[in-house]
């Protein structure tokens, strides 16, 4: 099989990751519709928008506990669990790079969630998107659970 993920697609994935990193999503007091705080709810809303834009079917729990995006058909579900919360950034003055920007240096992305778990979640999502773009038919559902 030829390269499935092109350089342009990789750049697009990094831009999406930067977009998601820009949403501060550390645990805050619960609010109505945001059981883990407004930041985490905002990250869930943004992730669902991203998944919609990429062609996934989405569902978001109205109470804000979870959402998912899926592709494929059939009775079986292959689940990919991702989380969008991060630890607080602490003293912003001690950061070399803005923790909520998603700074790319030498092909590495710096920012809250870039390694745990926003970055890996976007990588997995784009791997499936690349297969979708190649016309691959999934005979079971692949569900990304957030």
Predicted regions and their residues:
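Active-site metal-coordination/substrate-binding segment of hydrolases
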Residues: 77-146
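N-terminal helical capping/dimerization or prosegment-like subdomains
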Residues: 1-79, 86-90
